[in-house]
């Protein structure tokens, strides 16, 4: 079985082909970051238009990369949500049109389930069950995972996601969008403990997150350290970035440890754009070593949005016999716990 996967939920156009016998045989990705940087964030209308321009050429490139033709494809899957409705509709419309033309099944895939399954593409994939930390620009969730489709949300952000907090704080520090990587680069040059940020919601029970207060704390710290010209010196910028990042990482570490203790699990899977953060990876690895557990995450190229994770996740569900009709429907808001459980039905 060979599955074509299409990802268009936000500002990356991803197309990939997953082969049941050979694994991932094609992976094409186009990022719109440069286009949106001028606006300081993703412009939904521009994102949709760019997906229209890029998706079909990327499909052609993916087929070429895999040395396949349309006749070799056994199913088409696409991101149906969550995400920007216009962007989702582009991928959905193209995917379903191709499925109809090629007379193969089509299926909408949950974007965050795709992220959750991304580590399965690695040579040493995690075994079930595990706790998953899904951490991106739009989501921060801790999920109890017992199998494909067996999900329980243990905790999530009640306001800004971690990636969103990085971008907003980066903007306050004068960094261009998207600012997450740039904040981390500044943080590497920061002086530890010059500034101490709070660790939100760690002084009470529970596994929910809150990151919006850190942005406010950063703004107040910046304003309190401006020189007579209203500017921050470079070292102070680095020190604030360091304090902010350490607060986010420490908060995540505390919540992950609680989730593992609550479930009794020894495996932690981390996925999503922020999972590429070096400090977070280092500190999580240290925590899991102390707990005598294991941490898994995808290679950096599969941390951000991509077609590979969608193709693989769709493959799992199509192989299980799950399909949907050819109506064009997307779900900008979609709870992962609503997904069918295929863990005990041969998937």
Curated annotation (Swiss-Prot):
InterPro entries for the chain: ATPase_NBD, Gcp-like_dom, KAE1/TsaD, Peptidase_M22_CS, TsaD
Cofactor field: Fe(2+)
List of residues binding Fe cation: 111, 115, 305
Listed GO MF terms: iron ion binding; N(6)-L-threonylcarbamoyladenine synthase activity
GO biological process, one term: tRNA threonylcarbamoyladenosine modification
Primary site of residence: cytoplasm
Protein's job: Required for the formation of a threonylcarbamoyl group on adenosine at position 37 (t(6)A37) in tRNAs that read codons beginning with adenine. Is involved in the transfer of the threonylcarbamoyl moiety of threonylcarbamoyl-AMP (TC-AMP) to the N6 group of A37, together with TsaE and TsaB. TsaD likely plays a direct catalytic role in this reaction.
GO cellular component, one term: cytoplasm
Annotated S-S bridges: none
CDD domains in alphabetical order: ASKHA_NBD_TsaD_bac
Family the UniProt entry places it in: Belongs to the KAE1 / TsaD family.
Pfam families: TsaD
EC assignment: 2.3.1.234
Reaction(s) catalysed (UniProt annotation): L-threonylcarbamoyladenylate + adenosine(37) in tRNA = N(6)-L-threonylcarbamoyladenosine(37) in tRNA + AMP + H(+)
Record PROSITE patterns: GLYCOPROTEASE
Subcellular compartments: Cytoplasm
Textual note on the cofactor: Binds 1 Fe(2+) ion per subunit.
Residues given in the record as substrate binding sites: 134-138, 167, 180, 277
Species assigned in the record: Actinobacillus pleuropneumoniae serotype 5b (strain L20)
Protein name, UniProt field: tRNA N6-adenosine threonylcarbamoyltransferase
Keywords: Acyltransferase, Cytoplasm, Iron, Metal-binding, Transferase, tRNA processing
SUPFAM superfamilies for the chain: Actin-like ATPase domain
